[in-house]
Amino acid sequence: AALVQGGRERGLILHKLIEEVLTGEVTEAEAALIERAADLIRSLGRSPVADPATGLSADELAACVARTLALPDIAALRPGLLAEFPVYAAQATDGVETATAGIADALTVGKDGRPVVVVDWKSDVNPDAQTLDHYRAQVRAYLDMTGAERGLIVLMTSGTVMLVLATKSTEGEAI
């Protein structure tokens, strides 16, 4: 595998690119993905480079998104996968209400309109164990907030998909 320079800008572009594919703003055709990735690189005031080890490569970014969308776990969810979904929760503890808000990168909903699977795209090149634990906790919080059954942490660069299950059962809960 080619060396890839990670970083915040790469993550922003990958998230935006995959969001635009899911919303239909950009097609999955390779040329369209490359062109849009190059536009996004330039919008950050950078110039696209050929070698992803030295900067932001439109070809590498487009290929990463295409590979991610083709992963079996993601391909199976694609027909109902919604991008950038706000999640909220309020919890009262000892008379103090705490509100939590976030944005799930993508999720699916069941026939009843309730979230089923929460997907979190991660662009890290080689995350360490502590980072992965943080990601699991983040997705578990989204599961608890939404009542979704399971979450997927998708490490886009490596193509690894990690399953996260909710901490509490959502079966039979009163609505």
Feature-to-residue mapping (PLM):
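Compositionally biased non-globular segments, especially hydrophobic aliphatic-rich helices
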Residues: 40, 169-173
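Nucleic-acid nuclease catalytic cores
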Residues: 98-103, 108-169
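Acidic, low-complexity intrinsically disordered tails
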Residues: 1, 5, 152, 162, ...
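A non-catalytic, helix-rich entry segment at domain boundaries
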Residues: 1-96, 159
